Amino acid sequence: MVRVRIRQHVNPLASKYQQSVTIPNFSDIYADIKKPLYLDIGCARGRFLWQMAQVEPEWNFLGLEIREPLVIEANNWRDEKGLNNLHYLFCNANISLGKIFESFPKGILKKVSILFPDPWFKRRHQTRRVVQPKLVEDLANYLTVGGEVFLHSDIEKVAKEMCNRFSAHGSFYRSYNDWLKENILPVLSEREKVTLGKNQPVYRALFIKLEEPTPNIISP
């Protein structure tokens, strides 16, 4: 399949991305809608989830991506492989996450990853970063107790900001105080492979969903 060429950066605050997603019938997509669900926010071309769905067939996988051509391409790859535990959805996660999970059985979301999100380096653009307080709040509402959130970045400031947002909520605790030295997921993302290939650091953190929220310590 010819690789789709797309714009590297998409402004999630643009009006065209403020519309809530049209929800498909997930029971028609997944062979077993009751399997535990792994969510990848900002899945890009979706190759990470494409591999995960094959490595862990007892799970369902959902990738969210704001660049529609990549979603179309990723679902085509899924169909070519005949995977019935994987789907990609075009949406703005900060707008549509709650609506998406109202369409799934309650308590189905067990794991979430946000891997190498767009850093939006300029200060005036940092409100475009994907990990905003609203996103963390939505994940706190739908992730099961004991559920895991994996955060990866090759930019330390971005990784710290993501960690601060989750620590500030009170429904999550960080499982290790320092960065994880190794990737504890069974598959490496495309970006992580490239970063490690250049002998550059990857900043990884794991957060766990608490049963009862703790008082906020860090301001978002």
Swiss-Prot record:
Active-site residues per Swiss-Prot or TrEMBL entry: D118
Taxonomy, superkingdom: Bacteria
Statement: the UniProt record of this protein carries the keyword Aminoacyl-tRNA synthetase: no
Pathway(s) per entry: tRNA modification; N(7)-methylguanine-tRNA biosynthesis
Gene Ontology MF term list: tRNA (guanine(46)-N7)-methyltransferase activity
E.C. number(s) listed in UniProt: 2.1.1.33
Keyword S-adenosyl-L-methionine: yes
Positions that bind S-adenosyl-L-methionine: D40, E65, N92, D118
Binding site for substrate: K122, D154
Keywords, comma-separated and alphabetical: Methyltransferase, S-adenosyl-L-methionine, Transferase, tRNA processing
InterPro entries in the record: SAM-dependent_MTases_sf, tRNA_(Gua-N-7)_MeTrfase_Trmb, tRNA_methyltr_TrmB_bact
Gene Ontology cellular-component annotations: tRNA methyltransferase complex
Reaction it catalyzes: guanosine(46) in tRNA + S-adenosyl-L-methionine = N(7)-methylguanosine(46) in tRNA + S-adenosyl-L-homocysteine
HAMAP family reported for this sequence: tRNA_methyltr_TrmB
The family this protein is said to belong to: Belongs to the class I-like SAM-binding methyltransferase superfamily. TrmB family.
NCBIfam families named among the record's database cross-references: tRNA (guanosine(46)-N7)-methyltransferase TrmB
Purpose: Catalyzes the formation of N(7)-methylguanine at position 46 (m7G46) in tRNA.
Name under which the protein is recorded: tRNA (guanine-N(7)-)-methyltransferase
Organism field: Trichodesmium erythraeum (strain IMS101)
